[in-house]
Amino acid sequence: MRFFRRKIAIIVILAYAIFSLYAAYNVFFSKRVISRVHRVVKKGSVIIETGKAGEKEWNPWEEDERAHSVVVQKRRDAFRLYRDQAAKNRPKTYKVQIWGKAAIGLYLWEHILEGSLNPSDKSSQWREGEIQSGKIHFSFYTGPAVVQGHVPPDTDSVVLVLNGREQQKISYSVQWLQHVQSLIQARTISRVAVVLLGNEQCNNNWISPYLKRNGGFVDLLFLVYDSPWVNDKDIFQWPLGVATYRHFPVVTLSSQMVKKDRPYLCNFLGTIYKNSSRESLMNLLKQNNMEKDCLMHAREKWLPQETSDTSRQYQMALAQSDLTLCPVGVNSECYRIYEACAYGSVPVVEDVLTPGACAVGNRSPLRLLKDAGAPFIFLKDWKELPVILERERAMSQKEKTERRMRLLEWYSSFRQQMKDRFTEVLEENFFKIT
C-alpha cells in the first residue's frame, strides 16, 4: 500500500515538472500568437502593418501598370491643352441688332449685307433675318409691326435705320431716337449707330443733339449724300442705293445679261418737272431725233409707288439699254444710278452741284461713288450727249460686253466694300476690335 502511494506521488511530481518546463518554454522561447478576436488594435497600427505587408508583396505587373498610368495621364494633359488652345483660338462673336424703320434698311440688309428675310413676302407686317459678317452676328427686324418696345433686345448694341428726308419722317425718327434713349437710361442697350437717309439738301441739323460728340448717345452716324459732316471717324457717308420702297429687287446676274446685244443705246423713264434738267434732256432727245435709239417714257406727276406693270417696264428698259441717263433731281445722287448698275447699264450722270448745304469741292457731287472709282460717264451739260451716243454707235459688241462686265464687277465690289466698311467700323467702335 505504501509502495502504491509513493508511485502516485512520483507521477504527480513528474507531471508538475513537465508542465513547468513547458510553461517556461512558451514564456521565454516561443513566438506570441494573439487571437484576432481578443487582441487590442492600437490607432494607426492597421495602416502601418498594411503598408509593411504591401512593401513585402511583389507585383509582377507593377511596372506595366505604372507605365500605362503615365501614358493615360499624358493623353489627358494633351487633350486638356488642345481644348484650352481651341477655346482661345475660337473667334469671339459679337451681336448687333438692326432695326429697319426706313426703306434704305432693306438696301443695307439685302443688297449690302446680302441677308435674307423671313417671311419672304414683302407685304408682311414683321420680317426678320440673321447673318454673320466679320466677327459680328447681325439680326435684322423690319416691317410695320416692328414698333417701339416690341423688338426683343438680346444685345446691348443697336443700329437704327431712319428717314430724315422730310419733316413728317423726321418726327417719326425722333420718336424712335427718344425710345432708344430711354433704353440707354434703363441700361438695356449701351451702344447705338444710326443709318440715316438724310435730307437731299444736306440739312440734317435736327439729329445733331443726339450725336455723342454733342452730348448725345449716338456713337456712329452713316449718312446718305455728300454732307460736310462726314469725317470718317464717327460720321461716315452711306450710299443711297436702289428704291427698295418700290420693291426694286436684288438682281441675279446671268450670262445673257452680260453678253446679249441690247436693242437700245440709252433709256430714260421718269417724271419731268417744269424748268428742270430732265425737261432739257427730253427736249434735246426729241430735237436730235434720238427717240429710236433711246427708250423714253415721261410722266408729269411723281408716284411714290409703282404698279407691277410700270415696275416691270422700268426694269426691262434697264436690261435692254447700254446706257441709262441720270439727270439730277433735288440731289445729284439718285436711285436710278444704282439700279442701272444692277442691270449692267452704264449710268450717264449729270455731274453738277445742286442747291443746298451739301459739300462743295473737287470730289463733289457723288463723292462716295467717285472715290470708289465708279466707271460711269460723267457730263456737265446734256448738250454733250449727242457726241457720247455717236461714240456708242461706233463701239463693237465685244467692247460693250467687256464694259458691261467691268460695271457689274465694280458694283459687286462696291457693295462688298460697303459691307466690310460697315462691319469694321462697328467692330472697332462698338467692340474695340482692330
Swiss-Prot record:
Task: Give the Extracellular membrane side ranges.
Answer: 29-434
Q: Subcellular location, in the record's words?
A: Golgi apparatus membrane
Which processes are annotated in GO (biological process)?
protein O-linked mannosylation
**Effect of a null allele:** Embryos display mild to severe hydrocephalus and significantly reduced eye size, reminiscent of pathological defects in Walker-Warburg syndrome.
Domain of life (superkingdom): Eukaryota
Top EC class of this enzyme: transferase
The protein's matches in InterPro entries, at most eight in alphabetical order, are given as:
RXYLT1-like
Reaction(s) catalysed (UniProt annotation): 3-O-[Rib-ol-P-Rib-ol-P-3-beta-D-GalNAc-(1->3)-beta-D-GlcNAc-(1->4)-(O-6-P-alpha-D-Man)]-Thr-[protein] + UDP-alpha-D-xylose = 3-O-[beta-D-Xyl-(1->4)-Rib-ol-P-Rib-ol-P-3-beta-D-GalNAc-(1->3)-beta-D-GlcNAc-(1->4)-(O-6-P-alpha-D-Man)]-Thr-[protein] + UDP + H(+)
Sorted alphabetically, the keyword list is:
Golgi apparatus, Membrane, Signal-anchor, Transferase, Transmembrane, Transmembrane helix
Tell me what topology the record assigns in the membrane.
Single-pass type II membrane protein
State the coiled-coil residue ranges: none
Q: What GO CC annotations are associated with the protein?
A: Golgi apparatus; Golgi membrane
Chief location of this protein within or outside the cell: Golgi
Q: Which spans are transmembrane here?
A: 8-28
Does Transferase count among this protein's keywords? yes
Q: What GO molecular functions are on record for this protein? A: ribitol beta-1,4-xylosyltransferase activity
Q: Which residues lie on this side of the membrane: Cytoplasmic?
A: 1-7
- Pathway it acts in? Protein modification; protein glycosylation
Entry EC no(s): 2.4.2.61
Q: Which family does it belong to?
A: Belongs to the TMEM5 family.
UniProt function note: Acts as a UDP-D-xylose:ribitol-5-phosphate beta1,4-xylosyltransferase, which catalyzes the transfer of UDP-D-xylose to ribitol 5-phosphate (Rbo5P) to form the Xylbeta1-4Rbo5P linkage on O-mannosyl glycan. Participates in the biosynthesis of the phosphorylated O-mannosyl trisaccharide (N-acetylgalactosamine-beta-3-N-acetylglucosamine-beta-4-(phosphate-6-)mannose), a carbohydrate structure present in alpha-dystroglycan (DAG1), which is required for binding laminin G-like domain-containing extracellular proteins with high affinity.
Please give the PANTHER family that the UniProt record associates with this protein. RIBITOL-5-PHOSPHATE XYLOSYLTRANSFERASE 1
What is the protein named? Ribitol-5-phosphate xylosyltransferase 1
The lineage, from the top, is:
Eukaryota, Metazoa, Chordata, Craniata, Vertebrata
